[in-house]
Amino acid sequence: EIFQISKRINLVIFGRGTVGGTLIEQIFQARADILKRRNINLQIVAIANSKEVVFNHKGISPADYTAFDTLKVPYQISELIAQVQQHHLENLIAIDVTASKAFVENYLPLVENGFDLVSANKIANTIGYPFYKKLRETLTQYKKQYLYETNVGAGLPLIDTIKLLHHSGENITR
């Protein structure tokens, strides 16, 4: 942030359902205001479902997102991590908006490879204490954060979304 250079945050979003799609749309709509008001450049660099991904190290455009079915390629989590490393991406946040028990197994390799975690998936916190303990130890070892929020109403994580919108300059009313 020296000399007014914005901080780039690279987002990898896992899940394209109702919650994931809404989150992606909100990010596209709010990121110009977030850049202007907070000097944070949010870039979605990957959008994935359980089997396929669209990746662009420079950032995915709304048009790329709309063309997901045309641009998607099969992937494994290790390949996606390798792509991120190949392009030397920093300030990585993996966002899990799946409801998948299987996807939670990717949390440890993501953290070990430089990702902070944000999740609307409740499973990691309820899968069992041994996994939760290992996740917390790995987060501490790699100095990473794990933020999570359960869903309400129409299935959208509310508190952090409201905070983000407020910080981007939106007026919140009852």
Where are these regions (language model features)?
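N-terminal glycine-/serine-/threonine-rich beta1-alpha1-beta2 phosphate-ribose binding loop
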Residues: F3-N113
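Conserved anion/nucleotide-ligand pocket segment
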Residues: T161-R174
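Rossmann-fold NAD(P)-binding glycine/threonine-rich loop
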Residues: T98-N113, N121-I162
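Short, hinge-like loop/turn segments at secondary-structure boundaries
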Residues: P62-Y65, R136-T138, L164-H166
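A secondary-structure boundary/capping signal
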Residues: G15, A120-N121
